[in-house]
Amino acid sequence: MLGNFSGFVPFDQQSFEAILDPDHMQFRPRSQVEEDPSFKQLIPYCILQVGSGPERRLFQYTRGSGQGEKRLHAKRSIGIGGHISREDAAGPDLYRCGMQRELAEEMVIETELSEQVLGFIYDDSSPVGRVHLGVAHLLQLAAPNARARESELIDSGFSPISELFTHRDHFETWSQLCIDELEGRC
């Protein structure tokens, strides 16, 4: 099981299923949970990658001031995603429905892709980190045919992972954790 951690933990199917267990999961108004670390808001965090090995590139952007989470404005990021909502529960797999909805809202992806679940992300060093639990997904694109749909994803595009690693301090904590994990896989 996942247990108590901070940072990045490799994916474990049993822990993931426990998180999604209806006996443990509930929908609450964001106003009730945004400042309460006893509740963890589940966030699919999708990383778009093209290429392989040292030549691979990740989609990255700067969060604009109109994006939902004010505490992350002006931060650089490699993750696309957002909150699972009650509306996502209408589908057969609420987590996947939420992830696909967030991707469709924020990105235009016009190429084939494959998916790998990398792991869990939790950052207890900041107020925003203490109330969210991320599930990092690596989306391997066949070609770099992806662009931001949402106008609040600014200065976006694909960059070599080595460049992102060199400038990792400009990125939000979750992105730093994922860049470190992916850089170690070269």
State what each model feature region is.
Residues 54-63, 145-152:
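Short, well-ordered strand-loop elements centered on a beta-strand within folded domains, enriched
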Residues 110-119:
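A short coil-to-beta-strand element that immediately follows conserved catalytic motifs
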